[in-house]
Amino acid sequence: MRILYNSRDPQYKTPFGTVRTGQSCFLRIDIPKTCAAVRVTLVAEDCDGKPYREIPFSRAEETADYVLWRTEFTLDRGLYFYWFRVEKPDGSFRLFRQGDGTNMEAGEKWQLSFIPADFSVPDFARGAMMYQILPDRFYQVGQCDLTDKLRPYRIHADKSETPYYTADAEGNWCNDFYGGNLAGICEKLPYLQELGVEVLYLNPIFMAYTNHRYDTADYKRIDPMLGTAEDFSRLCAEAHARGMRVILDGVFSHTGSNSVYFDRNHVFGDGAVSNPASPYRGWYCFRRYPDDYDAWWNMPTLPNVNELAESYMSYIIDDDDSVIAHWVRLGADGFRLDVVDELPDEFVLRFKRRLRELKPDALLLGEVWEDASNKRAYGVSRRYFTDGELDSVMNYPWRNAILRYVKGEDDGTALGQTLETIAENYPPQVLQCLMNCLGTHDTARLLTVFGDDFNGTKAEKAERFLTPEQRKTAIDRLLPALLLQFTLPGMPSVFYGDEVGLQGFEDPFCRRFYPWGREDKSILALYRAVIRLRKESAALRGGELRLRTAGGGRIAYERVCESQTARVFINRSDSIWQLGAEGQPEFSVGLICCGDELALQPNGLCVVFT
């Protein structure tokens, strides 16, 4: 007989997942009578694996075969890992996690986070639909203002051209532009509103040399090719009038070398390189002035900053006209923090507090590629949620699990485990506003991922597109992925152009210009269908997630709220799945109905409401 404990089962642990400080956590463990246990102890370790506290269980009731042991406790705010010690008259053994159950002496430790009692996220972000735009690549209105554009640059004469993937004659990279601007985004707000967008996430708009603009030249100035501060204010005002919020990309771990602050090219006159007495000199770490300095991933165009330098913190966060204050007053509703794992916790927490002072319902999300609840960076356990630093993160573990499942590389069991791990490890309010992205500026285009595993040179990838057969495969995989994206908790995020079938391998090919006039209307129809399904369902937007079945090529789960239950079934197996009498199907592909009985054909899917 096995020892019974499942941290995801309310019989054995409440509350589910994270616990607020001051709130009690209740645990139960069932030990066979044949084990003759005389003492059971929960051993809690801190985030660094050091002993923190031992919590005894009390012998509670008995069943025919088991003794039920219970405990109640609370811990200080923080991230913990725990296991059990079971003592018997003739010795003791340790108990660890194995899947949903337990295992003696080997396995993983359970994770438990105590979060701030007042942890909250903006209401507007819960379940909202996000749309990500790389501003240079979306839409252009009027002529580009090149008067103050940092040089040299290259302008595409044809919006359908492939992004350049080689350096220019002087060895410069990422300096080709298409001319997309803020006025262009503003003009397309009716399209975005009709699509169902509620949050606009803009990749960097600050003045910079490159087209991606992650090499900031001036934090308080719009890149002249994108427009003016007035253009940004107008965009925010019109977006707000249409029920949308606007989130900016904040790049604060490094600046550009060609910037007001560093001025390696001696363009601005008062940077750390061009002026040894520069007020920005203390922001940077020079090993040998002025040419040898600390840079992001050793890229000389991206000098790292010392984020904890008081003058830098004041400039970005605390001053009356700080960078945060400047953009919030112009209309921004929050920030995404680029490479947040390279920003010190003190910086992130101070940023969050100041942002909320300026706009109490502002959103702060971070770029994290792993499970953010237990993320370690440079040997330090990050406190994104245990200190309430972030409201949300980019949900890449979720993305990877969905792609592997839909492509047949993993089964429903693996996907279900990932979904349950995320739900258990993240605070429930964070779960509702996770940035659930299937594609971003840092990944290959979704249609390409689903249709082509080609691994050639950049020159080969530049003009490679799906064949008709590959496209059919990609479309067959796209719908189940979209159904998962728009029926699971969080903010489903669409990267501009994915909804109309834009193709491309990794950067820079995933950053083509939006194909206005050449949209794939059949793919757009799929997006509209799942967006409408979510928008019309209270359960799909904000209901509790309950996993029902996960195995083989199949997965089923529920979203439950007071007024409605939505049941989602996806069958990626090669056999018919008998569902029984589940309710009224509202959305389906490959559904077989026989009276009240439902079944799904191979590669079928459906959503049922009760």
Features from the language model and the residues they span:
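The feature marks proteins involved in alpha-glucan
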Residues: 1-24, 48-132, 138-158, 164-165
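Carbohydrate-binding surface patches
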Residues: 14, 26, 548-582
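Substrate-binding/active-site clefts of carbohydrate-active enzymes
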Residues: 134-198, 205-330, 351-358
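Aromatic/acidic polysaccharide-binding cleft in carbohydrate-active enzymes
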Residues: 136, 378-379, 385, 435-466, ...
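Active-site-proximal helices and loops of the catalytic beta/alpha 8
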Residues: 236-245, 253-254, 259-270, 333, ...
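C-terminal beta-strand-rich structural cap/linker in extracellular carbohydrate-active enzymes
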Residues: 31-33, 80, 595-610
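Conserved, mostly hydrophobic/aromatic
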Residues: 29, 133, 192, 202, ...
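Beta-strand-rich binding/interaction modules
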Residues: 29, 36-53, 80-82, 575-593
